[in-house]
Amino acid sequence: MLRNGNEGMSTIPGFSQIQFEGFCRFINQGLAEELEKFPTIKDPDHEIAFQLFAKGYQLLEPSIKERNAVYESLTYSSELYVSARLIFGFDVQKQTISIGNIPIMNSLGTFIINGIYRIVINQILLSPGIYYRSELDHKGISIYTGTIISDWGGRSELAIDKKERIWARVSRKQKISILVLSSAMGSNLREILDNVSYPEIFLSFPNAKEKKRIESKEKAILEFYQQFACVGGDLVFSESLCEELQKKFFQQKCELGRVGRRNMNRRLNLDIPQNNTFLLPRDVLAATDHLIGMKFGTGILDDDDMNHLKNKRIRSVADLLQDQFGLALGRLQHAVQKTIRRVFIRQSKPTPQTLVTPTSTSILLITTYETFFGTYPLAQVFDQTNPLTQTVHGRKVSCLGPGGLTGRTASFRSRDIHPSHYGRICPIDTSEGINVGLTGSLAIHARIDHWWGSIESPFYEISEKAKEKKERQVVYLSPNRDEYYMIAAGNSLSLNQGIQEEQVVPARYRQEFLTIAWEQIHVRSIFPFQYFSIGGSLIPFIEHNDANRALMSSNMQRQAVPLSRSEKCIVGTGLERQTALDSRVSVIAEREGKIISSDSHKILLSSSGKTISIPLVAHRRSNKNTCMHQKPRVPRGKSIKKGQILAEGAATVGGELALGKNVLVAYMPWEGYNFEDAVLISERLVYEDIYTSFHIRKYEIQTDTTSQGSAEKITKQIPHLEEHLLRNLDRNGVVRLGSWVETGDILVGKLTPQIASESSYIAEAGLLRAIFGLEVSTSKETSLKLPIGGRGRVIDVKWIQRDPFDIMVRVYILQKREIKVGDKVAGRHGNKGIISKILPRQDMPYLQDGTPVDMVFNPLGVPSRMNVGQIFESSLGLAGDLLKKHYRIAPFDERYEQEASRKLVFSELYEASKQTKNPWVFEPEYPGKSRIFDGRTGDPFEQPVLIGKSYILKLIHQVDEKIHGRSTGPYSLVTQQPVRGRAKQGGQRIGEMEVWALEGFGVAHILQEILTYKSDHLIARQEILNATIWGKRVPNHEDPPESFRVLVRELRSLALELNHFLVSEKNFRVNREDV
């Protein structure tokens, strides 16, 4: 993106920058703002006063390293010291005191809470201020309302009814007259009439009784309290009543905050100072004036678009952490007040540090944050599946969470793409399912204005001044500013020099797309990727795909498993390097120097006469059980520069993102094995470890003290267990490093002491107890066993001992997983499928040079899904493979000329055909296709087949974690039917349609078994199990199953008695029996 040296230069911002900027703002401003709000604590007699100062607070370096915090399940935090003053009589003490620990962000933009990486994602909420809307009622009459939203999220509504009276609705049920509200806020009737444009309307609706209620502020407050709190009877004005009203209403519904004050001033043309952050009577009257103007046609009928980004604000990590710090300080205030009372009772002399005791504060602060990270919906477990997920997770924007929308109640309009999202929020990248449109991702160039919370997008300014100076300045526009500019939508690449000669260009103005003359353009886009998120920007030829498939692709790239041998894509978009760099999975040299030595655990670097040790990550488990591993890439003795890659992480090659493999694919049907998105693969992918991945599982066990006070014991000496189950344990009873373990093997031996019950005593034990008073104790074996599907190699064992009786042992097991039938694979165009069969390579279709195909996809998956980008990618990938080239292609290349993508692909295929002297690579009759042969017979297929090299990913949805079977297991307490889910050892549901299918075949006995005996027939299911084990005949039962009993009881509740009868076959006698 360079033009004439540095003119018009623009760089992509750091993808994790938003998280770092937010946390820095919290540390530099947020802490000080909350400490300034901390009140001076005094006792009732004013003999003692305690105060915290916002200036000069200090954060110490964390006492533990990141790696140790993860292994020992601790929180990576820093101790906060604040200046405090205590006035006790005439004695004034100043002291710097510790008030607790604050979680610290690490280099990944995440937090470590109790050993787990967590991240705080950005929340997008309706901005505080006033919003007007008009809607028709059931009679077709327009109703106008104004909604005031506070900084806390509280809502109040102003409305005009049919009798032209103005009401304020302070909650869903209560509404009060606007005059009562204004009077309760401190205005008298004269002031109200002087400050409004329509005094005659205000005077028209109050009757004599209502006028009496607003004679004074006290009467108005009493009337307001009576209606707001729904209290009857005669009330007496008091200070406590005022305080309650202040706390319940004015603080929650009238605090606008800095952003709300700006929005209110802008919307109602007011000039109230910015530091006045509460709702004033003047605001309410101006808002009512505007509403009257809308109703009677003298104002502008402009409904506010609630979904426009100018009416939204971002609550970043800074705002959420600041809220929690304020909450913790509120708790600290109560704790200090209690301590002051205790000081007077004990008659001891206090100091600032004794008032802030460790039990009341440091625990208060850290527990507040740990509760926040553990329960708040926007504080999520950091997704570490691959480097892309680590980069993308911090850039998410969510409408969910406290004060936001919910998946079940959000409307279609709130989920839809809005023109103001252009260049700010990606129109493609969102979740599938119930939260579609509610969670999005920031566009790659977007940044957050942390002062106002708006999302800004960069544009090139091409005003007259900029043209005269012959320079292009990059300006960041907020959503409320770019409405006033003509923005050129197309031709957004700086390299396109011929843009000025074009007469007419597509442009965007006030949320409309127009075609206007180039001279009228004010600003233009700076980059073709500007509108997309990182996930969308990694899809080559995205302009040829349907948006729904692009959405699936951007989501599935985040599910790709890092492979044992990574390979970078032949066809990419150019953003792979930046994504890998910003994920921080690779080790980058922070200074220049010379490599002394390197191994799998560390790199030693000599720089400026110092030896620096750079630790590497070796087979560390991620949050998603994938393997995080760094491989050194610099030999001994090599001189390196600052910024050079020293070691590569998982799923990166040469500093670029490498999520999948380039494999030879053919689009053709093959014996029905690729019907409905199934995929046929060659055994080469298994035997040559093409799609082999490593996964690390963690198993842990903890010792505890029993209710009798006896401690559990970790030991190898476990009676009644076969020797081969204990073969991998060392003398301490813990599995040895490097052992190969199978399902059912003991990983950690543990015995839990138990006191034997009276009835279980043998005669000798009873004698010992009677004579010597000795208790006979027995131990129960409660060892940690390897569950089903956990076989693998033990790579790490952690023994964490906090006290003699509290021991935790963690065992990490590495699994090597080849690709197998049932695994899920996907391309970068939403083309996903399940492996249906692994064919011997000699049976796979082969090319004219004898190369067998690696994967066979169904060609019917392309036209209906409209993801033609995969065809371009596979054909260009084949050319790149033969020419030993890699391509990095920006999207929307059709802006240069028509059919630009197709021309590029065909020209490269032609070049490859010429260089390799293989005419079948490009055949003019059917370009991109080739005649291929059946591996089983050697005969050519009837039709030419599209072949190519596609970049295919292996996804984390693997059959090893899905496959499940059950003979017997837990049952639901209510229905007595098997529970659902693999984790609960649940059963397979036979639904309505499955029952129809079985009925269609007339299998009455199988249906009876499934619906009764194997499900909720309590007695029969036990007897059938015994009959199956002992090989006996399955008994017949006449009593009904539980679901039938439930039906009978439901009918009884409707006063319908149901009885069944037994008819004797011999004499057709009817015997009536109760159910």
UniProtKB/Swiss-Prot annotation:
GO terms for molecular function: DNA binding; DNA-directed RNA polymerase activity; ribonucleoside binding. Keywords: Chloroplast, DNA-directed RNA polymerase, Nucleotidyltransferase, Plastid, Transcription, Transferase. DNA-dependent RNA polymerase catalyzes the transcription of DNA into RNA using the four ribonucleoside triphosphates as substrates. It comes from the Eukaryota. Signal peptide: none annotated. The gene is rpoB. In plastids the minimal PEP RNA polymerase catalytic core is composed of four subunits: alpha, beta, beta', and beta''. When a (nuclear-encoded) sigma factor is associated with the core the holoenzyme is formed, which can initiate transcription. Belongs to the RNA polymerase beta chain family. NCBIfam families: PRK00405.1. SUPFAM superfamilies: beta and beta-prime subunits of DNA dependent RNA-polymerase. This is DNA-directed RNA polymerase subunit beta. It catalyses: RNA(n) + a ribonucleoside 5'-triphosphate = RNA(n+1) + diphosphate. It is found in: Plastid, Chloroplast. Pfam families: RNA_pol_Rpb2_2, RNA_pol_Rpb2_3, RNA_pol_Rpb2_6, RNA_pol_Rpb2_7. Its main location: plastid. It is an enzyme of class 2 (transferase). CDD domains: RNA_pol_B_RPB2. One of its GO terms (biological process) is DNA-templated transcription.
